[in-house]
Amino acid sequence: MAGIPGLLFLLFFLLCAVGQVSPYSAPWKPTWPAYRLPVVLPQSTLNLAKPDFGAEAKLEVSSSCGPQCHKGTPLPTYEEAKQYLSYETLYANGSRTETQVGIYILSSSGDGAQHRDSGSSGKSRRKRQIYGYDSRFSIFGKDFLLNYPFSTSVKLSTGCTGTLVAEKHVLTAAHCIHDGKTYVKGTQKLRVGFLKPKFKDGGRGANDSTSAMPEQMKFQWIRVKRTHVPKGWIKGNANDIGMDYDYALLELKKPHKRKFMKIGVSPPAKQLPGGRIHFSGYDNDRPGNLVYRFCDVKDETYDLLYQQCDAQPGASGSGVYVRMWKRQQQKWERKIIGIFSGHQWVDMNGSPQDFNVAVRITPLKYAQICYWIKGNYLDCREG
């Protein structure tokens, strides 16, 4: 392994040129591309002062820098990329550390990432995230809520959504626990909620056996042991690249014992089945309900997917997923390819337009998140 100094554009083009195979094994089977992935490894760790946990929780974020603004900016240097992928870890006792990372390349391929500048002016954000008719579906009944893939969606005590991505790990948006300056109130005692039937036998009670109302559900909460937030989110808010790094990983104090959804590198939008994405979350206009939606991707940059899936605050942090054919195992598999972040108000060719935005899991981000989960880069060679 050897670090590659200078601009990461060479790694990016190597990835695009040789890092993936043909996206289709057959015309009717959209197939997960095979990537050769970089390695992100810790180099040093420093102890930091305890945070004050004074920030107000934000259930959505916004940015005025749209696709063209994003695409027109230069790639980060190697040193900048290392800074963005370095991360803070917060522990349940309130202590925290900062870990610097190195980026390494195996088999002559790697990854690069674009970021936005803050020079683009934008309109003020509108208060809606619903486009035309509300196309969201509330999921009712334990037969659906407790089964895959809906059972992978969990609720954070700060008000956001998360997705189960390993036996003890939850992927969510960074802004759900950190505002870019400090941690939000309640993060030190952060909990993750799992829907379960309100009654032990899964029924509705003796007097409700014939009721047509949906079965009552409740949340069972598990405390979070530690959280990881990339420095790109913390440092990036100073120059408007933060949205590219709006993701965080939570480690639970004990296993959740549910089926989880693996993470994967986000394919180009044109390779997604039907050009669509899916996600489920706990939108705050439908309290207590898990809300599912799917929609077409309207535009993309290297780090973001722009879409108009109907969503409301509270859905932030939802795992964006697709279902594609896994050639090696000869089976269909869903993977998380992004994290729903929030709303963006964009000037498109002189005409205002608004989007909902998801952070893509790029090869570098995959390598980082996978290492957080596995603790061994050798287990993170397949995206």
From Swiss-Prot:
GO annotations of cellular component type: endoplasmic reticulum lumen; extracellular exosome; nucleus
Positions of the catalytic residues: H175, D240, S316
A Pfam family annotated for this UniProt entry: Trypsin
E.C. numbers: 3.4.21.-
Biological process, per Gene Ontology: proteolysis
Modified residues (Phosphoserine): S109
Signal peptide: 1-19
Principal subcellular localisation of the protein: secreted
Entry's Gene Ontology molecular function annotations: serine-type endopeptidase activity
Name of the molecule in the record: Serine protease 23
Organism: Homo sapiens (Human)
Taxon lineage: Eukaryota, Metazoa, Chordata, Craniata, Vertebrata
Gene name in the database record: PRSS23
